[in-house]
Amino acid sequence: MSVEDVVRINLDFLDHPERSGIFNVGSGRAETYNAVAAAVINAVRAAGGRPPASVEELVREGAISYIPFPPALVGRYQNYTKADLARLRAAGYGAPTLTLDEGVRRYVEWMMARERG
């Protein structure tokens, strides 16, 4: 989930004090670590004028590699997370959130702009 979306949702609640409660905030879409890694790598590639690559291509290129799952985490790790936005939507917040690729792209561009000064 993009920080932009979190801020947008919080500002919406400030504008609507009649809404109260505890709400899940997220995109409502489950994303894999592969998708997150590919989004980051492809955003950096795009900034350098290179075309996006699939996860499979990124693995072949060595941009994504895997390590064995730590035995200490077996049975203790939540490998699937997807925010249930039903209460948030029922409270009146209906704006869409950025896609994973768009949110990561904006963040990478922001970070690179800061590096350039």
Where are these regions (language model features)?
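C-terminal substrate-binding subdomain of Rossmann-fold SDR/epimerase-dehydratase oxidoreductases
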Residues: M1-G117
